[in-house]
């Protein structure tokens, strides 16, 4: 039986997201918007598209790796993926508390993180990844049903936007924040972002490429975001924490552009191999870049970088992390291709 080749386009798509996210983190930790005001013009669009983009890519890959197969064959792999992302949250969250907050390495520091009662900064998204894959596992049967019925899936995605109107102020339990959001601290609630998971499934299921209907829908969604943004008295961005319907809808056109760009890049493999490598090892790059950035900020608190220097820092960090993958990965394994989820 022939082995299905890995979909390189979605790896490139994820690689673009990683490239943007790590650059954004470098700017946030080592730049100053007062001194380098242009940095915020990069941070805002990267913030807009990144988490939604990862949710989309997760839905896309899960459709190929899991929902196209019987539950009995894949449930343990989904659990393993969720466990990996949870461990990544534990490591990143602990590193943030130790390096950035200068907390002591004690049980009182680590225990709340392990129990999901503490969501350290720049690590919450990893907890949300865990919730996302667990939600995808718990809803395996209905999601598989929706994936086979395009219009039902699109309707469900639209209806999920209504969850952005829930009373966030009534939610105070920390473990609920990655699921449904809160106003108490920054979080990435997977229920509100779940429309992108469904869209990712549908794109994978129906092999969506360029489609005028998709382009029009994405343009309307992003246009609504732009209208809300620019029509405000102070022209401030729509609410991100917790996400408003405008914020969730906002990146649609940009992400569709990323998606089409990645499909074009797929036709020219050699120049974009580094992006593919980022996309195949998303979780490792996000985790290790966080740990290295936290450690560097702790060691170099006065370091101040402009846009170009922050980019060089990002490339250095990604090179170090890529080297760590290269020295522990066997060539035969590197050559093997699969559609399994790697976050």
Sequence positions of predicted segments:
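Alpha-helical transmembrane segments and their immediate juxtamembrane cytosolic regions
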Residues: 1-343
């Amino acid at each position: 039986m022939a082995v299905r080749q890995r979909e390189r386009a979605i790896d490139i798509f994820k690689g673009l997201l990683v490239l943007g996210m790590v650059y954004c983190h470098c700017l946030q930790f080592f730049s100053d918007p007062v001194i380098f005001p242009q940095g915020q013009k990069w941070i805002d669009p990267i913030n807009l598209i990144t988490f939604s983009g990862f949710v989309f890519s997760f839905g896309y890959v899960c459709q190929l790796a899991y929902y196209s197969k019987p539950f009995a064959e894949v449930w343990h792999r989904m659990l393993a993926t969720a466990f990996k992302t949870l461990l990544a949250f534990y490591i990143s969250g602990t590193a943030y508390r130790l390096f950035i907050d200068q907390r002591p390495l004690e049980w009182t520091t680590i225990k709340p993180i392990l129990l999901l009662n503490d969501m350290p900064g720049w690590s919450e998204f990893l907890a949300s990844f865990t919730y996302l894959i667990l939600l995808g596992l718990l809803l395996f049967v209905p999601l598989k049903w929706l994936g086979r019925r395009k219009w039902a899936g699109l309707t469900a995605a639209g209806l999920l936007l209504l969850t952005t109107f829930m009373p966030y102020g009534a939610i105070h339990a920390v473990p609920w924040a990655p699921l449904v959001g809160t106003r108490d601290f920054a979080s990435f609630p997977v229920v509100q972002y779940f429309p992108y998971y469904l869209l990712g499934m549908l794109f994978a299921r129906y092999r969506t490429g360029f489609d005028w209907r998709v382009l029009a829908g994405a343009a309307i969604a992003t246009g609504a975001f732009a209208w809300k943004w620019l029509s405000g008295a102070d022209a401030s961005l729509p609410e991100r924490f917790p996400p408003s319907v405008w914020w969730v809808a906002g990146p649609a056109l940009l992400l569709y552009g990323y998606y089409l760009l990645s499909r074009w890049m797929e036709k020219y493999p050699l120049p974009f191999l580094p992006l593919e490598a980022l996309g195949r090892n998303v979780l490792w790059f996000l985790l290790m870049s966080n740990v290295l950035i936290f450690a560097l900020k702790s060691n170099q608190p006065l370091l101040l970088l402009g846009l170009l220097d922050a980019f060089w820092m990002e490339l250095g960090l990604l090179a170090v992390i890529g080297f760590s993958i290269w020295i522990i990965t066997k060539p035969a394994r590197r050559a093997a291709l699969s559609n399994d989820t790697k976050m």
